[in-house]
Each structure stands twice: as C-alpha cells, then as structure tokens.
Amino acid sequence: MNTTTEQDFGADPTKVRDTDHYTEEYVDGFVDKWDDLIDWDSRAKSEGDFFIQELKKRGATRILDAATGTGFHSVRLLEAGFDVVSADGSAEMLAKAFENGRKRGHILRTVQVDWRWLNRDIHGRYDAIICLGNSFTHLFNEKDRRKTLAEFYSALNPEGVLILDQRNYDGILDHGYDSSHSYYYCGEGVSVYPEHVDDGLARFKYEFNDGSTYFLNMFPLRKDYTRRLMHEVGFQKIDTYGDFKATYRDADPDFFIHVAEKEYREED
C-alpha cells in the first residue's frame, strides 16, 4: 500500500491520461479525507432506496460491489440483507472500507482487483454488479473500457444486472460545470470542481476545509457513448436515470445511472 499523503502528477498534470495511474492518486491522505467528501448520512438520504429497490425487484441476492471505495454501498447492501463481495483497485480504499464496516458491525469480504482481469480474481457468478461513484471514468482508453464491461458481463448470472454511474460529462463538456453537489458529494465544507476539461480529460480538484487539496484525473465519458459500449458488449436492455429519476432534461443531472440487463431478449 502507498504510505504517502502526497499525489504525484509530474510536471504537467494534464498529460496524465493513464488508466493505471488512479491507484497512485488515492494516497493515504486523500483516502483519509474521502468520508468527509462522501458524508454517509447525507448520501443515504439523497439516494434513498434507489439501488436497493432496483436490486430487489430483480430478485438479486449476490452482489459484487466493484468500486467499493470506503465501503458506503457495501455496508448499505449488507444492512439490507444482500450477500456482498467488496472489490476495488485501491488497497488503501479497501483497508478503509474494512475499517468502516467493522465500526458498523460488519466484516466485509474484500478483494483487490483490476477490472480488466476481474474474473481472474473473483470466483463464481453474481446476480448484480454495482460500479458507482463515477469510478468507471478512471479508464482512459476504449480497449480498457470494453474489456472491463466484458469482464462484468461474464461475471454476471444469465439474468444479472450491471448498475454503473457516471458524472454528467455531457453537461460539463457542452455547457460548463454547474453543480449543486446535492448527490454523491454531500460533505459540508468540501469543494469539488473541474480544474481542467477537454475531450480526453476531466481533472477534478477536491478542496477540504482544513486547507488540504487533492486531484483526480478522469476520462469525460458521454452518456450515449457509455450506453453504446454496454450494448456492444452484450447488455440487452439499458435504462438510464438522471440523479435517480427516470425523466430528466439531459443538461440537468449531476450524475447518470445506467441499469443494464444481461438477460437475452429475442427480437420480435
């Protein structure tokens, strides 16, 4: 695990557009601040039971949390009665998630994975995979995105579902950044905004009330592009929600949530 609190993006941070760099971005100092950014109580109130209901109405019981972070969704799903395996590419995040789970009376089953080789490190099949917190946008090239979606598809049962979210990068690219931060980033005294945006990079700055500052470099995925990749990998039916609502104007949501079903559907 990293033992540093300092991020390193080199001389020109906007040139860091590498899928493998994200593990270096989640240094101990940033991970320690993450729960200030993701206020658990506020986030639970903002989300309501959206994910729990989406899973329950499909009869899902065995869930892979593919982007565990500090454990918010893993713990919520465990408390709702689901069988959860908690995965992440960051050892620092998994350690924090395990600690958070233990504080709430749960022992998380954690596994460090690289999504591109997911099925090498996890075992069995799942009724659902969740990939939340804008995590999919850490993948900077299409080959990695296709491989990851294929790995997710393979890890699902025949009637399984993938729930994947992303920032509304369409709105940021086309209209600039304007967010009330009413979803996902709910912590008080935390400022989150893009320092640099172009078609190949969204560099977000995270400012905390103690004066500390961190950054994440991510790829600005457009909504319809993500949906197309899902279809091409094999997902049959994809519903996209804007800030947990089925009806929305494309420019309005902070986040999109894609609910992609694997179940094969014959054409009429």
Swiss-Prot record:
The keyword Transferase applies. Catalyzes the methylation of glycine and sarcosine to sarcosine and dimethylglycine, respectively, with S-adenosylmethionine (AdoMet) acting as the methyl donor. It has strict specificity for glycine and sarcosine as the methyl group acceptors. InterPro entries: Gly/Sar_N_MeTrfase, Methyltransf_25, SAM-dependent_MTases_sf. S-adenosyl-L-methionine binds at residues 26, 34, 43, 67, 88, 114-115, 132. This is Glycine/sarcosine N-methyltransferase. PANTHER family: GLYCINE N-METHYLTRANSFERASE. It comes from Halorhodospira halochloris. It catalyses: glycine + 2 S-adenosyl-L-methionine = N,N-dimethylglycine + 2 S-adenosyl-L-homocysteine + 2 H(+); glycine + S-adenosyl-L-methionine = sarcosine + S-adenosyl-L-homocysteine + H(+); sarcosine + S-adenosyl-L-methionine = N,N-dimethylglycine + S-adenosyl-L-homocysteine + H(+).
